[in-house]
């Protein structure tokens, strides 16, 4: 008589529907990390700094190749 309820409880615990605490914690950590990554946005100032850096490098390369770029910057 007692074996049937114990068997049912063990069957429920061993079923794939029962969440594994470690897997559940890992999933929640991954979800939290994904949400934090989604909140990170590149600021407009950072984008402008990157564009300015690329522009400076392009000007240096242009000045090494031809004088026309350097003359335009000085005027």
Swiss-Prot record:
The keyword Disulfide bond applies. Residues 1-19 form the signal peptide. Expressed by the venom duct. Contains 2 disulfide bonds that can be either 'C1-C3, C2-C4' or 'C1-C4, C2-C3', since these disulfide connectivities have been observed for conotoxins with cysteine framework V (for examples, see AC P0DQQ7 and AC P81755). Its main location: secreted. The keyword Nucleotidyltransferase does not apply. It is found in: Secreted. The modification Pyrrolidone carboxylic acid is found at residue 60. GO terms for cellular component: extracellular region. GO terms for molecular function: ion channel inhibitor activity; toxin activity. Residues 20-59 form a propeptide. It holds the Pfam family Conotoxin. InterPro entries: Conotoxin. Keywords: Disulfide bond, Neurotoxin, Pyrrolidone carboxylic acid, Secreted, Signal, Toxin. Transmembrane segments: none annotated. The cysteine framework is V (CC-CC). Belongs to the conotoxin T superfamily. This is Conotoxin Vn5.6. It comes from Conus ventricosus.
